Amino acid sequence: MNIKTRIITTSCVIVLLLNNLSMLAQTQNTNLNFGNPTTEEMKMTSCSLEPNAPAVVLCRLDDVNYEIRDGGFCVVYEIKERIKILKPEGKDYANVSISYVDFQGNLMKSEKINGLKAVAFNMADGKIVKTKMDDKLVFRERLDKEDMLMKFTIPQVKVGTVIEYQYKIVSPL
């Protein structure tokens, strides 16, 4: 291996290591326990990285698994997200749209959304009050022959609210 190749390889390894270390440092203080926002998250009034931000994503977890279902292989994407509403315009983050593929009449190729849960957490009299989203607030909209949107609005959202939602997309291979 010549010197130029060795330098490039070493540089790439160093960059990858530093990237992994920075990701590790960022996740050390992140609350990964969904359903239980911390007092610190509830009391937060601004984001130090972006003081004018209307909202801040406190945590987003994307998990991907491969499974055998209904006699075939599929990919299961599990998404969990927690957002703090900091300003009135941040309330728009409570309006969520999830796109997915739905081939009319061909269930073997269509994606499915399962396990949708959404919650708003507010402070009242020094206690955290949890408001669950009712399934009646979930709507589906067809965009074209193949594409759909699942839309919902998390209730009781105001400045200071922490919202959480989670769902799974099951996608056949």
Predicted regions and their residues:
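N-terminal secretory signal peptides that target proteins for export/translocation
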Residues: 1-6
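Bacterial N-terminal signal peptides
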Residues: 10-22
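Beta-strand-rich, non-transmembrane domain signature
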Residues: 26-173
